[in-house]
């Protein structure tokens, strides 16, 4: 069994969708100060794997563990430790950027408006704090979603295509924040189609081979 007592472990995970075997015995480990870059062609199960890892989808076979224990047995502790960003920013259009952060982050921990505004500042969208999400550009929404991840103060980041709709500056900023998170003792599992420009302990897993 592939189990890490100081991080995340995925051991021989299998997922089917109807007759299609989407994940075929996927295993991985991720420890503090590490980044795992997951790549692969469309339809190879990258998003499915992230959903399994964050506990949104139960695999037909296999085990996901956190600190040596099944995530189902330490659900509260695990959910407190992780921050998940899907491939869509998932913002409520009628709420402002700040309200979106307050709603999402408030489910995990107590947070002040000042902390949330600081996260928006770090991701370059402080000027959007009081604007409804529906008027923001795709790139701005992506930056707000990144601010949400920062605000959660989680040790484990699970990011699905975090560079989508970002310009060069936004891509560089996201890479820098990823590097800072990992260098600070965090861990990150990132689905991305292109190479990641970060100078950390980075592993790679390509699905569909």
Q: Positions of the model-derived regions?
A:
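Conserved ABC transporter NBD signature motif
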Residues: 62-73, 77-78
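Q-loop/switch helix immediately C-terminal to the Walker
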Residues: 88, 93-109
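Helix-to-loop junction immediately C-terminal to a conserved catalytic motif
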Residues: 54
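Hydrophobic anchor residue at the start of the ABC signature
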Residues: 146, 185
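Catalytic Walker B motif of ABC-type/P-loop ATPase nucleotide-binding domains
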Residues: 157-161
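Conserved ABC ATPase signature
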Residues: 94, 132-139
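Conserved ABC ATPase "signature" region
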Residues: 102, 113-129
């Amino acid at each position: 069994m592939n189990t890490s007592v100081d991080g995340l472990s995925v051991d021989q995970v299998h997922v089917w969708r109807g007759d299609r075997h989407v994940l075929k015995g996927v295993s991985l480990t991720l420890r503090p100060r590490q980044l795992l870059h997951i790549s692969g062609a469309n339809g190879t199960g990258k998003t499915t794997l992230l959903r399994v890892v964050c506990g949104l989808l139960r695999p037909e076979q296999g085990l996901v563990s956190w600190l040596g224990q099944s995530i189902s047995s330490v659900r509260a502790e695990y959910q407190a430790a992780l921050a998940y960003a899907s491939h869509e920013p998932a913002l409520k259009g009628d709420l402002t950027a700040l309200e979106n952060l307050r709603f999402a982050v408030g489910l995990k921990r107590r947070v002040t408006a000042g902390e949330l505004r600081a996260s928006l500042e770090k991701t370059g969208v402080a000027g959007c704090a009081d604007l409804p999400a529906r008027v923001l550009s795709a790139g701005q929404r992506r930056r707000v979603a990144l601010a949400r991840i920062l605000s959660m103060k989680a040790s484990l980041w699970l990011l699905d295509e975090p560079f989508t709709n970002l310009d060069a500056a936004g891509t560089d900023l996201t890479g820098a924040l990823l590097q800072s998170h990992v260098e600070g003792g965090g861990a990150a599992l990132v689905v991305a189609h292109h190479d990641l420009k970060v100078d950390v302990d980075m592993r790679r897993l390509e699905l569909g081979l």
